[in-house]
Amino acid sequence: MNSKIYIVGMGPGTGEMMTPQADQALCGSDVIVGYPVYLKLLGGKYREKEFLSTPMKQEVRRCEMCFEEAEKGKTVAMVCSGDAGVYGMASLLYEMSEAHPGCELEVIPGITAANSGAAALGAPLNHDYCVISLSDLMTPWELIEKRLAAAAMGDFCMAIYNPSSHHRADYLKKTCDILQKNGVEPERACGYVENIGRENTACEVCTLAELRERQVNMFTTVFIGNSRTKIIGGKLVTPRGYVLPDPAV
C-alpha cells in the first residue's frame, strides 16, 4: 500500500473558510507539516497531531520531511495557505515525488486569496482575469514586468499577490507605473484587502493613482479592475456584460 501525503490548501486561515475536505484530510493525518505561521493558524483543533515545520526559504527541506514521515508508514498532510496549487507547495512535492515512487500524493483544494479577497471587495474578477505575484524570489523582475504589461494591454482584471515586503517596499508603486505606461488610466477602479478572512481584515476601494501611494504588506492582495470595472455602493464590481433592463420602462 502506498504511503499517503495530502497537500492541503487551508484557505485564508480560519476554520470557517477551510473546506470540509481539507478538514477531513487533516483529521485523518498523523503528521501535519507546514510553515510555522500556517500551523499556528490551525489553532488547537489538531493538537493531537505531530506538527513539523521549517522557516521560510526551507521549502525543499519541508517537502523532504513529508516524504520521510510518509515512508515510515504515517499519513502526512502538508498545509499551505490559500490553495496549495496557487503559489503553494503542490508542484514542488510532485517534482520531488519522482524520487519517492512509493508515496501517493493528493491535492486538497483551498480558497485562494484571489477568490476570498474578491468576495470581500465585491465582484472585481467577474470577467477574464489573471493572477500575478510581485515576488522576485524565484521569478526575475524583468519577467514580472512583461506579464504586468501584457495583462494591462489585454485589459485583464488582475489579482496581485505578494505586493510588498521589507526588501520590495516600492514594488507596488513600480507596478502602478508599469500599468499606466501600458494603457491603464490613473482613474482605474482598484482595491486591496489585508489579512483576508482573519479578525483584522481591512478592505479599501480606490483608484490606481491612489493605490500607487498606499503602503501595503505581504499579507495584502491587490485588485486592479479592467476598463469596465466600477465602484458601486463602495464595492468593486466588474460587469460580466449582461444587458440590463431599462429602469424607465
Regions found by a protein language model. Give the residues of each.
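Short gly/ser/thr-rich secondary-structure transition/capping motifs
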Residues: 11-17, 139-141, 204-206
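A contiguous loop/helix-start segment that scaffolds small-molecule binding in enzyme catalytic cores
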Residues: 5-7, 76, 153-249
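Class I S-adenosyl-L-methionine
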Residues: 1-105, 116, 212, 248
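Short gly/pro/ser/thr-enriched loop/turn and capping motifs at secondary-structure boundaries
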Residues: 39-41, 59-60, 111-115, 137-140, ...
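Fold-independent oxyanion-binding glycine-rich loops
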Residues: 10-14, 34-37, 54-56, 81-83, ...
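Solvent-exposed alpha-helices and their adjacent loops that cap or buttress functional pockets
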Residues: 1-2, 24-25, 69-70, 78, ...
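Class I SAM-dependent methyltransferase SAM-binding "motif I" and its flanking Rossmann-like core
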Residues: 86-154
